[in-house]
UniProtKB/Swiss-Prot annotation:
GO biological process: maturation of SSU-rRNA; ribosomal small subunit biogenesis
Pfam families listed in its UniProt record: NUC129 (PF08157)
Keywords: Isopeptide bond, Nucleus, Phosphoprotein, Ribosome biogenesis, Ubl conjugation
Function: Functions as part of the small subunit (SSU) processome, first precursor of the small eukaryotic ribosomal subunit that coordinates the first two steps of ribosome biogenesis in transcription of the primary transcript pre-RNA and pre-18S processing. During the assembly of the SSU processome in the nucleolus, many ribosome biogenesis factors, an RNA chaperone and ribosomal proteins associate with the nascent pre-rRNA and work in concert to generate RNA folding, modifications, rearrangements and cleavage as well as targeted degradation of pre-ribosomal RNA by the RNA exosome.
Cross-linked residues, Glycyl lysine isopeptide (Lys-Gly) (interchain with G-Cter in SUMO2): K127, K157
Region (Disordered): 1-90, 235-254
Modified residues (Phosphoserine): S129
Keyword Nucleus: yes
Location(s), subcellular: Nucleus, Nucleolus
Compositional bias per record (Basic and acidic residues), positions renumbered to this chain: 71-90
Naturally occurring in which organism (per UniProt): Mus musculus
Protein name: U3 small nucleolar RNA-associated protein NOL7
UniProt key word 4Fe-4S: no
InterPro entries recorded: NOL7_C
Length: 254
């Protein structure tokens, strides 16, 4: 089913009717607003409002200068007391460590009887030979005086009182120069004798080349030395015999 709405008339309504309608609408709105204000609010919604009002009404606690100063002093005293406690704890730990270290040393040390024997022996040696010690000290002092007076000597000998070995004082610059010169000389000799320009070969190669190039063919000379082992000497002799036998066969066939 289709519902048809009535068409509005195009004739304008009178002004009095328009004013009456506006007044009626405004009166209805005021009545609704008044009803809403008159309705009592629920308890759950009213409680937070009351709490907020109470919190706003409460004033901050008053703190006098004397009370603030007393609190600051108390905090300072607490900090100092904690620092003192830490220091005392550290001292106790150090004392314990020292005690343990001393105990460990005592365990590692020799027995008292052996220590007494060593001390008595050292004292007896010192009593017997005080003159020798004085003589040695005098000699060493004289040697030091001579070393100071001698300006021409470049190398000085330094001897300590409790050491027997002597040490030589040398400049490192001189050592470096000497080493560099020696290396340069070695390099020059090697380049002259065994460089790319030098025509150096072994004796066997030189003789073999001459024998090959000469019109009269000869055997490649292979010298025997006493430094070789017996096996090398035997091998050289066999090689020579074989070579001679081959040459003799070739001549007979010709």
């Amino acid at each position: 089913m289709v519902q048809l709405r009535p068409r509005l008339s195009r004739i304008p309504a009178p002004a009095e009717a328009m004013v009456d309608e506006d007044q009626a609408a405004s009166e209805e709105e005021e009545a609704e607003h008044g009803l809403l204000l008159a309705q009592p609010s629920s308890g759950a919604a009213a409680e937070p409002l009351d709490e907020e009002e109470d919190a706003d009404d409460e004033a901050p606690e008053e703190l006098t200068f004397a009370s603030a100063q007393a609190e600051a002093r108390e905090e300072e005293l607490r900090v100092r007391a904690s620092a003192r406690r830490d220091k005392t704890l550290l001292k106790e730990k150090r004392k314990r460590r020292e005690e343990l270290f001393i105990e460990q040393k005592k365990r590692k040390l020799l027995p008292d009887a052996v220590l007494e024997q060593l001390t008595t022996a050292s004292e007896a040696d010192i009593k017997k030979s005080p003159e020798n010690v004085k003589v040695n000290l005098k000699k060493k002092s004289e040697q030091h005086a001579k070393g100071r007076n001698s300006k021409k000597v470049k190398v000085q000998k330094v001897q300590s009182v409790g050491q027997i070995e002597s040490y030589m004082a040398v400049r490192l610059k001189d050592e470096d120069l000497r080493d560099s010169r020696q290396e340069a000389a070695k390099h020059f000799i090697h380049s002259c004798l065994y460089g790319s320009d030098s025509k150096r070969t072994t004796v066997n190669k030189f003789l073999s080349l001459n024998n090959k190039r000469s019109p009269v063919k000869k055997a490649a000379a292979q010298f025997l030395t006493s430094t070789w082992g017996a096996q090398k000497q035997q091998n050289a002799k066999r090689f020579k015999k074989r070579w001679m036998a081959k040459k003799m066969k070739k001549k007979t066939y010709k």
